[in-house]
């Protein structure tokens, strides 16, 4: 409101006036009589008046104008009036003892043209005023002294703090410098260490470089020497090959010349009335053989020693053939001469008979000639004991199948799962058999042995055991034997070296679990009857497909497999059988004999030589069997073995050759060359892939 604003203005004006600036003692009533006594007493000078006269009045006189002198006298007369107590000049800071000192220096700055008049109070008031002024002065002096001391202390503290900060800064700088120096030293040490390491590494690299350079130079020299040696060997090989090639051409020329002599002997056929076609046929075969060797040689480069030996064998046979032909011609000539003599004698007798009609005519009986021999054929049937053994194995296999028929034909899902797990546990380890390492082969053997022993094994992330089903053991034994034979039929047929690791595991399992071995033989005889050896006979009323299956052929959709594939499978199974009979598990009991050892291999070889050979089959199986097992049989039977080899060469080869067509001569020639090489070196080589002692340490 407007009135409220004016009220504040009034109060502000009163506060700014002289009375508004006066100091009032609110406690004057407490003093009571002292105040009244002071007012009633006569004025007298205070003991401090001298100080006032000395310090205050001179300043007033200097500053007051002349016109104000009378006013001062008037004011002194008013000292007795207690009602008029003006403000003491000592209250003014300009006239205080402390401010007097400062006013001298700043006189012009604080000097005022108008000075208030000094009114003297009563002596007691002056005393009080002087005490107050004295106290104030002392207080100010003490305050100034305290302030000075405080300032000095603060300055000392500031100096101390400054010195301490300076010292700390120095220490900090020293520590920082020390840290930098230490870091520099560490860095220098690291650099020196790195430099030393780099120098050491450089020296090491230089040494390695020198060593490698030395090795490289040695290798280069060795390579150069090897190259020169290879060049020399290649030159010698070429020279030998060219010499053998020239020899082959000379052999071919001689064979052709002998063949022409065989053809020239055809003129004796009508004259002597003998059949010489067999000699010509065999001569043509030998010419074709030599021509084939030379043709193969021209494709492959130079002839080998085996090629030369085969050609020389053909030449020798051609010479023997021509010699036999000449002997046959001589015998025929002798026979013709004797017949002519006999005819002449008969004619003479007839002429004599004509002269004597009573004599009876005698008709001559033709002679068979000295070269005629009775036909002695080998047997086609297996021995009774072997056949009985074969039938016993097949019956045991059939009984095993019947034993797990419930598990095999079960419709229960749990039983099917158990059957599948058992089959995987039995067959997968056999599929993993390889020549990687002996330790790996031992792990596979231990897993199969544990499974057959009833212990749980891990298969497909699950624990499997034959104890899960009463028929589990029969099922596992049958499937395991079947898988071993299947590996021979497939894996060994493709990779001949695989026969040995599979055979050694099968032999070890056979030794610990004889029933598995019997089932292996049963499966082997069923798929490859020649492993008995057994040539199934065709029975009346038997379907042709069934007979072909009995012979070992695979028949699918009335289609019989190719002969090459059939021979390949038979070869794989015979190789597996030949490896089994000579190998034993190295970690087994050496005190016991082999469950199916080399004596069975000798029996097989003897029995197959006592049977009529089959075209292409007998030669293939004999070669595979002897290549795998020949070295072991040679060490076991020694002289008897070499007699057997000579028997094959001299007596059995002609029988195989007689039934082998020209398109099936490959297996026969391969067998013949193998045996001739063995006879030439008097040793059967160790088969490729045979497991040595170092394999079992891997």
From Swiss-Prot:
Cellular component terms (Gene Ontology): cytoplasm; nuclear pore cytoplasmic filaments
Interaction with NUPL2, as annotated region: 656-698
GO molecular function: inositol hexakisphosphate binding; phospholipid binding; translation initiation factor binding
Region (Disordered): 63-122, 336-377
Gene3D superfamilies listed in its UniProt record: GLE1-like
Region of interest called Interaction with NUP155, as start-end residue ranges on this chain: 1-29
Cross-referenced Pfam families: GLE1
Keywords assigned by UniProt, alphabetized: Coiled coil, Cytoplasm, mRNA transport, Nuclear pore complex, Nucleus, Phosphoprotein, Protein transport, Translocation, Transport
Superkingdom: Eukaryota
Coiled coil: 185-246, 308-356
Signal peptide: none
Biological process annotations from GO: poly(A)+ mRNA export from nucleus; protein transport
Mediates the shuttling between the nucleus and the cytoplasm: annotated segments: 444-483
Record's compositionally biased regions (Low complexity): 64-78
Modification type Phosphoserine: residues: 41, 88, 99, 351
Subunit structure: Associated with the NPC, however it may not be a stable component of the NPC complex since it shuttles between the nucleus and the cytoplasm. Interacts with nuclear pore complex proteins NUP155 and NUPL2.
Name under which the protein is recorded: mRNA export factor GLE1
Gene name tied to this protein: GLE1
């Amino acid at each position: 409101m407007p009135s409220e604003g004016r009220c504040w203005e009034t109060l502000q004006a009163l506060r700014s006036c002289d009375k508004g600036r006066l100091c009032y003692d609110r406690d004057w009533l407490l003093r009571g009589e002292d105040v009244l006594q002071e007012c009633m007493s006569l004025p007298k000078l205070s003991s401090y008046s001298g100080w006032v006269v000395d310090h205050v009045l001179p300043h007033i006189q200097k500053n007051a104008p002349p016109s104000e002198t009378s006013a001062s006298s008037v004011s002194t007369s008013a000292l007795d009036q207690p009602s008029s107590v003006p403000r003491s000049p000592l209250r003014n800071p300009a006239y205080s003892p402390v401010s007097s000192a400062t006013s001298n220096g700043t006189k012009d700055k604080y000097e005022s043209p108008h000075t208030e008049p000094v009114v003297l109070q009563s002596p007691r008031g002056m005393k009080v005023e002087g005490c107050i002024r004295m106290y104030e002065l002392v207080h100010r002096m003490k305050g100034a002294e305290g302030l000075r001391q405080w300032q000095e202390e603060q300055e000392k503290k500031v100096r101390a703090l400054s010195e301490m900060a300076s010292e700390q800064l120095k220490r900090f700088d020293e520590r920082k410098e020390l840290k930098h120096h230490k870091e520099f030293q560490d860095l220098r040490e690291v650099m020196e260490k790195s430099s030393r390491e780099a120098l050491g590494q450089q020296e090491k690299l230089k040494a390695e470089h020198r060593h490698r350079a030395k090795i490289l130079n040695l290798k280069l020299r060795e390579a150069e020497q090897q190259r020169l040696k290879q060049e020399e060997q290649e030159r010698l090989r070429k020279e030998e090959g060219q010499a053998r090639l020239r020899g082959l051409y000379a052999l071919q020329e001689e064979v052709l010349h002998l063949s022409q002599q065989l053809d020239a002997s055809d003129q004796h056929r009508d004259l002597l009335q003998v059949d010489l076609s067999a000699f010509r046929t065999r001569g043509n075969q030998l010419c074709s053989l030599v021509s084939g060797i030379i043709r193969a040689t021209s494709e492959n480069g130079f002839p080998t020693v085996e090629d030369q030996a085969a050609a020389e064998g053909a030449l020798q046979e051609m010479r023997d053939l021509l010699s036999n032909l000449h002997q046959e011609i001589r015998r025929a000539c002798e026979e013709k001469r004797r017949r002519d003599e006999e005819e002449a004698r008969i004619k003479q007798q007839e002429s004599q008979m004509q002269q004597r009609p009573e004599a009876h005519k005698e008709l001559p009986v033709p002679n068979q000639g000295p070269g005629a021999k009775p036909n002695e054929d080998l047997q086609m049937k297996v021995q009774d004991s072997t056949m009985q053994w074969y039938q016993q194995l097949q019956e045991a296999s059939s009984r095993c199948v019947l034993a797990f028929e419930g598990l095999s034909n079960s419709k229960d899902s749990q039983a099917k799962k158990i059957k599948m797990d058992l089959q995987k546990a039995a067959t997968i380890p056999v599929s993993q058999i390889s020549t990687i390492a002996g330790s790996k082969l031992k792990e596979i053997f231990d897993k199969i042995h544990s499974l057959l022993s009833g212990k749980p094994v891990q298969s497909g992330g699950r624990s499997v055991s034959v104890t899960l089903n009463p028929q589990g053991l029969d099922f596992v034994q049958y499937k395991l034997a079947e898988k071993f034979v299947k590996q021979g039929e497939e894996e060994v047929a493709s990779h001949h070296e695989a026969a040995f690791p599979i055979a050694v595991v099968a032999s070890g399992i056979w030794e610990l679990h004889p029933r598995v071995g019997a089932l292996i033989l049963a499966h082997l005889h069923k798929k490859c009857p020649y492993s008995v050896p057994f040539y199934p006979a065709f029975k009346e009323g038997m379907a042709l497909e069934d007979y072909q299956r009995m012979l070992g052929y695979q028949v699918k959709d009335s289609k019989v497999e190719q002969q090459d594939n059939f021979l390949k499978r038979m070869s794989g199974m015979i190789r597996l059988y030949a490896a089994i009979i000579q190998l034993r598990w190295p970690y087994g009991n050496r005190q016991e004999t082999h469950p199916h050892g080399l004596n069975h291999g000798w029996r097989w070889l003897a029995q197959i030589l006592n049977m009529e050979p089959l075209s292409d089959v007998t030669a293939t199986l004999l070669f595979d069997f002897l290549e795998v097992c020949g070295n072991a049989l040679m060490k076991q039977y020694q002289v008897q073995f070499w007699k057997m080899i000579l028997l094959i060469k001299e007596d059995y080869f002609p029988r195989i050759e007689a039934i082998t067509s020209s398109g099936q001569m490959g297996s026969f020639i391969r067998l013949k060359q193998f045996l001739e090489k063995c006879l030439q070196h008097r040793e059967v080589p160790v088969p490729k892939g045979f497991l040595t002692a170092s394999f079992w340490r891997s």
